[in-house]
């Protein structure tokens, strides 16, 4: 069995790790970085991922996609998506199935399809390090992701050519990374995970019994639309408002200017974690009839904190709920772990310290812990890590809609997964021949306020008075937190089963098509790389041959020189084309034509060597042996 890699597919940055021997190791990407920006850019005929995509964002804002994780598994009509439409420089569009898709270079794409590009880069990073093909992966998701978002993340993995062995929750992965090598008995930890786009809190108990460590999630809570991007947006809005106040120009209608402001805001936010004041200085941000305009705004840490105070406060509410669900108080928490880049903000650290009454641990890398934990889980699944048991939970309750628009829960939130639950229901009317099973996820009693995961019909029920037929509904929640539902008429034995796919979501056929497109692109990328290599080789040989022709001078016969010049011209012509084989053939032809040149170069080198040796010998012959005598100076 090949290695199973661990991937933290983040909103802002992604990270990949693998078990190297018995120790998890974060793998550096082609740019030498341990994390990769989750940014994808579409340019003419090329897809850029990571730092190269981020670098060109200012000049290509409409086709540079970032924070796609905020859209994954979401409907276009969702309130959060509508909020993002206002602030994203790229187009968010409604797909035929009602999902939120994006548009770049005139092409509509599903969020999993775009996220797959980041996963492909993570896969390639791991393959370059391991020197072998990688197919298996553990991918992390926010603990508070619903069924549709988990399913969409698995789809992204499939499109990237990965077999997703397990989807695990980010805080749980961080706990694995933290607790694996910690000795000293049982502990209860709180993982506060504030990333680029999502927030989670998980209360996890680590028990050690006879050498086996059990990581049991007691409760989880969060907000899948709260993160560093929101902090950035507060600062962006402030900078734009200040500029408008000062210059009377609204930058919001200028995508290029907004992209520059976005980059500057992110940089300023990071700087303000270690300094009390910074300058946002953007020369030539825009221009009007009076000439170019420059942005130069001082931002203090206090100002930034006042802009985001309510966001930090918003993250504290789920902490209270999670503790209550786990039936614990803050005094029961042994350690607090901070995960996610946004937790580097001093105000966030101060509020968490104040809430728990203790300083968070400093020995966990907030950017890498999640990927490291995913790699550990990969090792567990591959059988390389023994004595570790992970017991995760479902973040939200699951149930079906029953008479009067009520949600009847079959699986309560914070139930350990995998789990199975069933309940018997009946008909609401006399002689009803079919029932609709409407599957819901959420905590509200009114069905309409919960997330609809899908619905299906069970038909062929024998006519009977209402309340008589017995319909058994079974919920089977797997280890990835994905739901499978079946309904069975106990009298006739008729059964209907489905794996819940959101009323939107991608069908198997759509995923397959995207997988094939990704494969085709892979082939095209490979051909492009081979062609570029052949062209580079041609350039080197042309340059080297011309230099040798020059050095040979009169020693090269005119007919040989003409032959070489012709071969060079033909290679230059082939190099302009797209045919790798033709370039390689002309390279061989030039090398054959330059055979005489090689001989002359060899003869010249030998002649030079001979004359150098002769010169050295004659110098030796001219040496005069002399005797020195000491001259004493008698002068006093």
Swiss-Prot record:
InterPro entries: ATPase_NBD, Chaperone_DnaK, Heat_shock_70_CS, HSP70_C_sf, HSP70_peptide-bd_sf, Hsp_70_fam. This is Chaperone protein DnaK. Gene3D superfamilies: 1.20.1270.10, 3.30.420.40, Actin, Chain A, domain 4, Substrate Binding Domain Of DNAk, Chain A, domain 1. Residues 601-618 have a biased composition (Low complexity). Residues 619-636 have a biased composition (Acidic residues). Belongs to the heat shock protein 70 family. The lineage of its organism: Bacteria, Pseudomonadati, Pseudomonadota, Gammaproteobacteria, Vibrionales. Residues 600-636 are annotated as: Disordered. Transmembrane segments: none annotated. Acts as a chaperone. GO terms for molecular function: ATP binding; ATP-dependent protein folding chaperone; unfolded protein binding. The gene is dnaK. Keywords: ATP-binding, Chaperone, Nucleotide-binding, Phosphoprotein, Stress response. It comes from Vibrio vulnificus (strain YJ016). The modification Phosphothreonine is found at residue 198.
